[in-house]
Amino acid sequence: MKIFGEDGFRDLFKKGLLEEKFLNKFFSALDIFLKRQKVKKVFIGYDTRFSSKYLIHLIIKNLISIKLIYVGNKPLSTPCLYYSSKQRKSFSIMITASHFQKNFNGFKFFYRGRKLDKNYEKKILSLFKYVNKNKYKIKQIVKKVSLHENYLRFINERFNFNNINKKILVDFANGSTSVFKNKLNFLKNCNKINYLYNGHNINEKCGSNFLKKNINKKNFKKFNYCIAFDGDGDRALFSKQKYGIIESEKIAIIFLNYFKYHKGHSVYNVVSTKIVNPWLKEYLKNENNIRLYKTKVGDRNIINKQIKVKSILGFETSGHYSFYYAMDGIYAAGLFLEILKENPELIDKIINIPIAYKLKIFNFSSNCTKDIKRKLKLIKNKGNKIIVRKSIWEDTTRIYLFYKNSQIK
């Protein structure tokens, strides 16, 4: 059974990978791993799902070798916990299913300021056979603490402005970024929606999952720009009035141009995934002399490549943007609004650039992939590009068709 994806694991609450029996075994194995690594304290963050309380209790029950466990006193965004983990050089567990609906949950893991790497994941899985052999539990201290302060200070010092001469709508997806509603300086004068979380409304017809549909609603149309987060705040989508959702490739170009030509940073490359629009590589090379590196889909893959090639920016087409080697939707929102305030012409210029390839995404049951792929190869021979990717968490294979022929349906 596959457990880890590229960013922890998730499942339906109390089903599959989130069944109590499996989780007891997993966190007991994690406990052995942490003991061998001489980890003495663990930090736990969580988003706004109703199931978080149950999972916190289960984790604490099984980490019998950890002396100090700190639990956030309120929901926490994943970027916030990552920043806290990096500052404290600790082991941290984020309880979240990101953009998935309320009946899902899952876990992301951070160790020494980085996402848990594959070698550590393999070590944890290899320890399953030792579970239940050591029942000794040390005297444990569990504290509820605030884990927000350092991150909020970092963000507010970086984006120290609040007066933007545009009408901005921010959708918090009833997720963990909701707790920052009145604490982020750069959002002070923005209109805000979907922040009254109740444990059962995270990502419910709101946030980044539904921005494409919601921007057609009357209450969205009156704003110049909309920003939508997902449930744990590591992604952000942007839309402009009368344009629609701004493609992540164009957002990346906006960021890169701002860094290079307005902030004077050295920008030689950028990292994205294999499903990025093929147009981007040629555009960056010809217009900005910037090299595009591609890697497998997944936050960890992007960040590892970003570190390796020393890139100022990494991004996924889903709306994840990495600046300080972490995917951070809040930072992305702050940067976008900073550019909107200081150089709105740059945004207008970039979003009006024509994209050579259009994109269609086809979802199929995984057992149909071979037949579909064979048919799509006929289209590829006409100068189009095809990428086939199997979903980690669903029995679905996605086929990405990048095409120039407007006749394709």
List each language-model region with its residue ranges.
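Short glycine-rich phosphate-binding loop at a beta-alpha junction
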Residues: 39-47, 71, 167-170, 265-272, ...
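N-terminal small/polar loop signature for handling phosphorylated ligands or for N-terminal nucleophile
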Residues: 32, 41-104, 184-239
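An N-terminal, well-structured beta->alpha segment
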Residues: 1-66, 141-166
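Active-site nucleophile and cofactor-binding loops and adjacent substrate-binding regions
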Residues: 70-78, 245-248, 295-296
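Gly/Ser/Thr-enriched, mixed-charge loops and adjacent short helices
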Residues: 3, 12, 105-221
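Phosphate-binding and adjacent anionic-ligand microenvironments
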Residues: 223, 263-409
